[in-house]
Amino acid sequence: MAITAAQVKELRDRTGAGMMDCKNALTETNGDIELAIDNMRKSGAAKAAKKAGNIAADGTILIKNGEGFAALLEVNCQTDFVAKDSNFLAFANAVLDVAAASKVTIEELKAQFEETRVALVTKIGENINVRRVEYIDGANLASYRHGERIGVVVAGEADEETLKHIAMHVAASKPEFVNPEDVPAELVEREQALQIEIAMNEGKPAEIAEKMVVGRMKKFTGEISLTGQAFIMEPKKTVGEILKEKKASVSNFIRLEVGEGIEKKEEDFAAEVAAQIAATKKA
């Protein structure tokens, strides 16, 4: 299987490893990026694989409360200039109003606003996309927007200030689950197998490797879960400890960031200039 430059770039972005290391790893796995990451972590070629998705597209994240729920909406455009345009923001807010009023699906939102979207594209000169909408239920909800690009809503049993601070933490720390025990068994088993192999490759005896893995797994599930993370406002305590002190709890959260998973086309300026020079010579 031929390895493409795009695959090499994605692996470099996600691991921070060198180009040839990435190309070799992909060649060994026939282009399987996830397997390549695992193999590179085992060999030490990549120390971590934490970069989740290419954050490249522009746009805005908006939040609005409905009755017993909140709606989070992402609308994309091509540049940060248009992301601040009043016409673009008016369109995005109109879509949000409908979402918050009737909890409709993304497909219904797209269909309802398609004519308006096309007119806006013609007016602004950039592609506009109503990308996704998420809903979170709860009697007690707190929201936080970090600029225009990140939006968080947290549901739980706590005072408004506490939930707001938790929402700010979620924006900054990107947890994937509420509690360590919420991490899916498949993900835990995969990481555990990987950590055992890493420990064995370090030359540790089996019994020591097993103890090391227990500690590493506790760290792993803690780092990707909200209550297991160090609280950004009191780093010596976990979020779980803070909630316990306040006799509070979090049942769910949603975090959206503009452009998650969207790969924006990168312009090769040097190639563009070379092409223009070549075209001029032909003329």
From Swiss-Prot:
Gene Ontology, cellular component aspect: cytoplasm
Membrane spanning stretches: none
GO function terms (MF aspect): translation elongation factor activity
Subcellular location: Cytoplasm
Keyword annotations: Cytoplasm, Elongation factor, Protein biosynthesis
Domain of life: Bacteria
Residue span of region Involved in Mg(2+) ion dislocation from EF-Tu: 79-82
HAMAP family for this protein: EF_Ts
Role noted for this protein: Associates with the EF-Tu.GDP complex and induces the exchange of GDP to GTP. It remains bound to the aminoacyl-tRNA.EF-Tu.GTP complex up to the GTP hydrolysis stage on the ribosome.
The name this protein goes by in its record: Elongation factor Ts
Organism: Shewanella denitrificans (strain OS217 / ATCC BAA-1090 / DSM 15013)
Source species taxonomy: Bacteria, Pseudomonadati, Pseudomonadota, Gammaproteobacteria, Alteromonadales
